[in-house]
Amino acid sequence: MSTFIGQLVGFAAIVFLVWRYVVPPVRRMMAARQDTVRQQLADAATAAERLTESTTAHSKAVEAAKAEAEQVVEEAKEDAKRITAQMQTQAGVEAERIKVQGSRQVELLRTQLTRQLRLELGHESVRQASELVRNHVADPAQQAATVDRFLDELDAMAPAAAEVERPVAAKMRSASRRALGSLVDKFAGLAKGLDNAALSALASDLVSVAQLLQREVIVTRYLTVPAEDAAPRIRLLERLISGQVGNPALDILRAAVTERWSASSDLIDAIEHVSRQALLEVAQRDGQVDELEDQLFRFSRILDAQPRLSILLGDYVVPAEGRVGLLRKVLDSAGSVNPIAVALLSQTVELLRGQPAEDAALLLAEVAVARRGEVVAQVSAAAELSDAQRTRVTEVLSRIYGHPVTVQLQTDPTLLGGLSIAVGDEVIDGTLSSRLTAAEAQLPD
């Protein structure tokens, strides 16, 4: 019995423990599980409702999308029709524009082609004419006839005389021209009492003073300041050169600084001119003027044909002594050269002031001719002139310019025929080559 009671008590204890410690958690767990199940069921119901709503919304969206798509398609069709119409209109306008532009281009090309053909035809005509002229003047008699015809035309100009100035005075203004004339007259009176040696010394003294004035710009400017009282200028001049030059040179220079000059450089030009006149007077007394003039003109042509030599003689970087040495070396290699020509050319090279050497040499030759009251005419011909033609050229030009004329002839076969005459700055071009060139230049563009 006790065993049964003990087992009963044990069972009761177990039941108590289970009830006390096991049942409450189980109940709580079951309640939680029930809550979870209920929540899941509620969620499932909500999801089902949402699914139904989503399905309904999807169906509505699909229907709306279909309707919108149909609307977009219709609008696209309308836009396509409108764009097609616009493109057709624009294409028509563009086609018309291209057509008009094409017509203009065709007209422009036609005009250009016509102009080009005319130009080519003109050039070909000139070329053919040139060939005919060349063939015609290949006969010396026909070439001489072109000179005679030009002289006939030139002869008609003879009554209209032109005044030709001294070569040096051509670039001076009126005051300097008067001063130069007075200085030349002073020299002419002084030269009568001087022998050739004194004239040569005078030329050398004047060149040295011209070089001094060329270096001393301020002194030159002071000596040419316009003022009524020339005494201060004379005193300055005497302090500078007294005892260094001879009395004839000092007399010339005193007269020079008393004159009124338009520009400072004109004083140097005038002194250089008188120094040349002194040497030319020596040549005239010795009967060497013709030879001197010929050699000076020949040397100017050499410089014109040899630009390199002209540049070397006018190179201011090289001292004057070096350039004069080069000049003398060239003249010595040429054979016998008139000593006065050597002296004149040496002075010219020493006193170059920005002028090309070939122009300075030509001016020197013109000064030599002008001293005899003659005018220099540079005549260019395709061939040598006969004596009768040369005489006629001299006579016609003498009547035109009212002075005796010295003709310096140059031959250039490229001129074909006729003559080109240059007197100072005036050029009379009656060559066949220039007429052909003028004809070609007048062709339409």
From Swiss-Prot:
Q: Where in the cell is it found?
A: Cell membrane
Keywords per UniProt: ATP synthesis, Cell membrane, CF(0), Hydrogen ion transport, Ion transport, Membrane, Multifunctional enzyme, Transmembrane, Transmembrane helix, Transport
According to the record, the signal peptide region is: none
Q: Which domain of life is it from?
A: Bacteria
Q: How does it sit in the membrane?
A: Single-pass membrane protein
Q: Region ATP synthase subunit b: list its residue ranges.
A: 1-168
Q: Name one GO cellular component term.
A: plasma membrane
Q: Where is this region: ATP synthase subunit delta?
A: 169-445
- Which Gene Ontology MF annotations are present? proton-transporting ATP synthase activity, rotational mechanism
Q: Which Pfam families match?
A: ATP-synt_B, OSCP
TM spans (from-to): 4-23
CDD domains xrefs: ATP-synt_Fo_b (cd06503)
Q: Which InterPro entries match?
A: ATP_synth_B-like_membr_sf, ATP_synth_b/b'su_bac/chlpt, ATP_synth_F0_bsu_bac, ATP_synth_OSCP/delta_N_sf, ATPase_OSCP/dsu
Q: Which SUPFAM superfamilies match?
A: F1F0 ATP synthase subunit B, membrane domain (SSF81573)
HAMAP family under this entry? ATP_synth_b_bprime, ATP_synth_delta_bact
The record describes the protein's role as: F(1)F(0) ATP synthase produces ATP from ADP in the presence of a proton or sodium gradient. F-type ATPases consist of two structural domains, F(1) containing the extramembraneous catalytic core and F(0) containing the membrane proton channel, linked together by a central stalk and a peripheral stalk. During catalysis, ATP synthesis in the catalytic domain of F(1) is coupled via a rotary mechanism of the central stalk subunits to proton translocation.
| UniProt similarity note | In the N-terminal section; belongs to the ATPase B chain family.
| PANTHER family attached to this UniProt entry | ATP SYNTHASE DELTA CHAIN (PTHR11910)
Q: How does it assemble?
A: F-type ATPases have 2 components, F(1) - the catalytic core - and F(0) - the membrane proton channel. F(1) has five subunits: alpha(3), beta(3), gamma(1), delta(1), epsilon(1). F(0) has three main subunits: a(1), b(2) and c(10-14). The alpha and beta chains form an alternating ring which encloses part of the gamma chain. F(1) is attached to F(0) by a central stalk formed by the gamma and epsilon chains, while a peripheral stalk is formed by the delta and b chains.
Q: Which NCBIfam families match?
A: ATP_synt_b, PRK13428.1, PRK13430.1
Question: Mind telling me what this protein is named?
Answer: ATP synthase subunit b-delta
Q: Which organism is this protein's natural source?
A: Mycobacterium marinum (strain ATCC BAA-535 / M)
